[in-house]
From Swiss-Prot:
Record GO terms (molecular function): aminoacyl-tRNA deacylase activity; ATP binding; leucine-tRNA ligase activity
Motif window: 'KMSKS' region: 697-701
Similarity remark: Belongs to the class-I aminoacyl-tRNA synthetase family.
Protein name: Leucine--tRNA ligase, mitochondrial
Keywords: Aminoacyl-tRNA synthetase, ATP-binding, Ligase, Mitochondrion, Nucleotide-binding, Protein biosynthesis, Transit peptide
One record GO biological process: mitochondrial translation
Catalytically driven reaction(s): tRNA(Leu) + L-leucine + ATP = L-leucyl-tRNA(Leu) + AMP + diphosphate
Residues that, per the record, bind ATP: K700
Entry EC no(s): 6.1.1.4
């Protein structure tokens, strides 16, 4: 028998375990006859109540008990992916070896939604895996002198054990690790499919090189200060031959389909904005500036892309990127330029240093028109500047200090006293809206410095200027994108090997499908020696191979893939994790993708999500999905449908920890340096001073981390889950405060007490003859007033109305996800209404039991083990299956069998739940004196012919109240002696005229 105390009954009540078995078997399972009733007959009501009272709720025991039962059930039934029809996925973790509270938050959210959908009758896929490749594992292996595979597998085992303690419902038979050859075999297949379509190519390019990690970084992996996102080292610029994926081929659909993701707020607005900005589509013009040169090797003109051709009159200089072909050519004969270029790798990309190119000037193309103001005709200096990006536009900018912030800063750095030219203003009656130290960057109206264009709107003027210069070949309309092809080459060991061999005769040759996977070689001596760099480059036995095409000597590519390649498609592998022939089957992709709900941090808003969208679009227009495009162009044009990997995206907020600092030094204090004997006044142990308290991002340096496994071991997984949801809306930062969990544990204890009371209810109670809640209220409406029990009906209505309100509210919150915190608060409110003595004691037993049944099912996604125990105590006949088995098909109202194990839905009783109480405002001689709650008059008294009886009823009801008697039967006021008693609005207003 399941017990809410999670301890065997025979051990708790000596010599009773065996004797209870015949009692239980002789009392058939029935909603009318919970097991507590049978036991009361055998033990006696009082002894049974004392038995429960002597044993407190043991959440830790419940966790262990139900995790074991779930595991046994999973082994018996298996987990059939073919039956799944919903897909909930949290972003899979890097196996660092330790779960942190951020992990706990995202995985709690995912499991709660998956369990909610399961209770609604869906077959939910909730997989878990490991983003196992990458630099952290390789660096850890070097530091410890062990193989990264050994390190990674040990960490996976630790984290899997930790995840097991949080009462999750993961589909472990779908588990994957990206470092497993069975997984990266298919990553290599996808790469080769991209290569076949011309979407994977090798090119020499200037790259960002991390001298500490000794690998190439994508632009996105370099921070604003020019440092590596991993090591923090200053990034160097080097020219290397690298592998790229042609994401630019899909840029139009990547941009256009953001509109689909914006519908119904499926994706957060800020994520969509970040994606759009990263794609960076801009329309403008390519403008050609003729060059006046006084030496050889100089260009005849410099082309510049600008999105603001309206500011052409304001150009005061030209700036070139260090990689611009003209700069590279001029550097061959200019030692000073060479020296300047050598300093750039150590500079911030935002640096305003510059090198003025000697003997070369540019001419504004508008200078050739007579109407152009003289200032615009002056030749322009040309600089080499690090703030100009070599891979955007033409690698050149036209410097407009009056209307661009960066240009203004650069101009002031090199021409501090020189005037800034403003060529447009906010409105026609202003000469300028900018001060010398503040450029005007908005669109507006052209001013006198714009010659004949004065007074025109800047947008109109920009279009006219391009058309003016176009016949002479000096300007043309142009479209530019910020997005660059995805550089995936990494000069490191711990990643997916690129399945390419290089043959002296055949060139670049793909590894045949039957030779996949290309596995990483064992290099134990490299790790044992704690060596850095890419060990693949020295593994001659692995490098040297034969060409698949001609059979001659060839060498393997020694680069590995960016780990974002693995995470760009892992969600597809989960749906068909054991497929040995293909990454996934087209049939399963049709059923389970796109992912219904994807949950993770906003820090992945650009890279991971953008790459996943690109790869999914490719996969769904390829042979992998049962389609075959003849070329990359065909793949793009075939995308008349919207192919997006994640229907809905939820980004949860970070978890901040309580942080203590010394008020004198600002130093972060360790836990043992803070005296918390009075939690409200924490003190610095060393000085006795009050410590400063704040909530900040958790980190080792701030000594504010919390081990979630320790927390769960103390309070239990269910209480921890409820606490982490209750403390903040999903999208907001969660300030972790352990002390506040007491509110959650008190709530669980109250629910526990309710279940005990119902299971141990007295046999003297006469159960309702109605079989369902709806039937009960219909019977009550049909009963004659003479036999009705108003107190019972009022309490039953109060409880069931709150149940129906909570069902609607909680269902909406579960569906919305971002308001999961209100699920807890709503369920707490419902618990209070049910447990209120005035309601519980008076309500019909059927209503009490069904209300608690609904409460348990609504809280089950949040506190699954606790809910399972409560459910099986209330309805022991369901002990053969889990609350989450999903075997039922009913609505879940009015029975305790498996059909009731569904998430509750509104039962149509709203019209039957009209309150038997109403507020009556009482006036004395037309002035309102007080208001009281009175009984609602019977329908017959509302007839016009029953006015006198209605007056008598209302006066009688008012006098039943303490306030009514005090104010209408004393202090000189006697309603029985009133001149007139007026009843208005069916008794909602009573006017006593004395």
């Amino acid at each position: 028998m399941p017990l809410i105390c999670a301890r065997p009954l025979g051990r708790l009540v000596p010599k009773l375990g065996a004797s209870l078995r015949p009692v239980l078997s002789s009392h058939a399972a029935s909603p009318r006859r919970p097991v507590g009733v049978a036991l009361e007959q055998h033990l006696g009501t009082e002894s049974w109540k004392r038995f429960y009272a002597d044993h407190k709720l043991d959440l830790l025991a419940l966790d262990q008990k139900w995790r074991q039962k779930w595991a046994e059930s999973s082994r018996e039934k298996g987990n059939k992916e073919d039956e799944k029809n919903k897909y909930v996925l949290p972003m899979f973790p890097y196996p660092s070896g330790h779960l942190h509270l951020g992990h706990l938050r995202v995985y709690t959210i995912a499991d709660v939604i998956a369990r909610f959908q399961t209770l609604q009758g869906h077959k939910v896929l909730l997989p878990m895996g490991w983003d196992a490749f990458g630099l952290p594992a390789e660096n850890a292996a070097i530091e410890r002198g062990i193989n990264p595979a050994t390190w990674t597998k040990a960490n996976i085992a630790k984290m899997k054990e930790q995840l097991g303690h949080m009462n999750g419902s993961w589909d472990w038979n779908c588990e994957l690790a990206t470092c497993d050859p069975d997984f990266y075999k298919h990553t290599q297949k996808i790469f080769l499919a991209l290569h076949e379509k011309g979407l994977a190519y090798q090119a020499e390019a200037e790259v960002n090189y991390d001298p500490v990690d000794k690998t190439v970084l994508a632009n996105e992996q370099v921070d604003a200060n020019g440092c590596s996102w991993r090591s923090g080292a200053r990034v160097e610029k080097r020219k290397l031959k690298q592998w790229f994926l042609k994401i630019s081929e899909f840029r139009e659909s990547l941009l256009k389909d953001l509109e689909t993701l914006a519908k119904n707020e499926a994706w957060p607005e800020r994520v969509l904005a970040m994606q759009k900005n990263w794609l960076g589509k801009s329309k403008g013009a390519t403008v050609k500036f003729p060059v006046l040169a006084f030496g050889q090797g100089t260009p005849s003109a410099i082309e510049v892309f600008t999105s603001r051709p309206d500011t052409l009159f304001g150009v005061q200089y030209i700036a070139l990127a260090a990689t611009h072909p003209s700069v590279q050519q001029l550097a061959k004969s200019d030692p000073e330029l060479q020296a300047f270029l050598s300093t750039l790798p150590g500079l911030s990309p935002d640096s305003k240093v510059g090198y003025l190119l000697p003997h070369i000037r540019a001419v504004n193309p508008l200078a050739y028109h007579e109407e152009t103001p003289e200032d615009t005709k002056v030749s322009l200096p040309i600089y080499v500047a690090p703030y100009v990006l070599g891979d955007y536009g033409e690698g050149a900018v036209m410097g407009v200090p009056g209307h661009d912030l960066r240009d203004h800063a650069f101009w002031k750095e090199h021409h501090y006293d020189a005037p800034v030219r403003f060529v447009l203003a906010a409105s026609e009656d202003e000469s300028t809206t900018a001060m010398p130290n503040e450029p005007f960057t908005e669109h507006g109206v052209m001013n006198a410095n714009s010659g004949i264009f004065k007074g025109k709107s800047s947008k109109e003027a920009g279009e006219m200027l391009v058309k003016l210069l176009e016949p002479a070949g000096l300007a043309k309309e142009t479209e530019k994108w910020r997005l660059r092809d995805w550089l995936i080459s990494r000069q490191r060991y711990w990643g997916t090997p690129i399945p390419i061999v290089h043959c002296g005769s055949c060139g670049t040759v793909p590894v045949p499908d039957e030779q996949l996977p290309v596995e990483l070689p064992e290099v134990d001596e490299h790790w044992a020696g704690k060596k850095t760099g890419n060990p693949l480059e020295s593994q001659t036995d692995w490098i040297n191979t034969s060409c698949p095409k001609c059979g001659g000597e060839a060498k393997r590519d020694t680069d590995t893939m960016d780990t974002f390649v693995d995470s760009s498609w892992y969600y597809m592998r989960f749906i068909d994790a054991h497929n040995k022939e293909a990454p996934f089957s087209p049939e399963k992709a049709k059923v389970l993708t796109p992912v219904d709900l994807y949950i993770g941090g906003v820090e992945h808003a650009i890279l991971h999500l953008l790459y996943s969208r690109f790869i999914y679009k490719f996969l769904m227009t390829s042979s992998f999905a049962g389609k075959e495009a003849e070329s990359a162009e065909a793949a793009e044009s075939a995308s008349s449908e919207v192919y997006e990997p994640f229907k809905r995206l939820i980004t949860q907020g970070m978890v901040h920890g309580k942080t203590y600092t010394d008020p004198a030094t600002g130093r972060f204090l360790k836990p043992d340096e803070v005296d918390l004997s009075d939690p409200h006044q924490p003190k610095v142990v060393a000085t006795g001073a009050l410590a400063n308290v704040s909530y900040e991002k958790m980190s080792k340096s701030k000594h504010n981390g919390v081990d979630p496994t320790t927390f769960i071991a103390q309070y239990g997984a269910d209480a921890t889950r409820a606490h982490i949801l209750f403390q903040a809306p999903v999208s907001e930062i969660l300030d972790w405060d352990e002390s506040k969990i007491t509110g959650v544990t008190r709530w669980l204890s109250r629910v526990h007490d309710l279940v005990q009371k119902i299971a141990c209810s007295s046999t003297s109670e006469t159960p309702s003859s109605a079989s369902t809640v709806k039937a009960f209220f219909e019977q009550q409406q049909q009963q004659p007033e003479s036999v009705a029990d108003p107190a019972k009906l009022d309490a039953s209505i109060t409880i069931w109305r709150e149940v129906q309100r909570t069902i609607s509210s909680v269902t909406a919150s579960y569906n919305k996800v971002y308001t999961l915190n209100t699920v807890i608060s709503d369920l707490m409110s419902l618990t209070n209404v049910i447990a209120s003595p005035s309601n519980y004691d008076a309500a019909d037993p059927l209503i009490r039991r069904e209300a608690v049944s609904a409460l348990i099912r609504m809280m089950a996604p949040v506190a699954p083990a606790f809910a399972e125990e409560c459910w099986h105590v209330l309805f022991p006949e369901s002990s053969s299956s889990s609350l989450f088995s999903g075997s039922g098909s009913g609505s879940g109202s009015g029975s305790g069998d498996e059909q009731a194990a569904r998430f509750p839905v509104p039962d149509g009783t709203e019209g039957l739940l009209k309150s038997r109480k109403q507020t009556c405002a009482v006036q004395l001689n037309g002035k309102t004196k007080f208001a009281v709650e009175i009984g609602t008059p019977p329908a017959g008294l509302l007839e016009k012919s029953a006015e006198e009886k209605l007056r008598e009823f209302i006066v009688g009801e008012v006098l039943k109240t303490e306030e009514g008697r005090a104010k209408l039967e004393g202090r000189g006021v006697d309603v029985s002696k009133a001149k007139k008693v007026i009843v208005v609005r069916g008794g909602k207003l009573l006017n006593v005229v004395m």
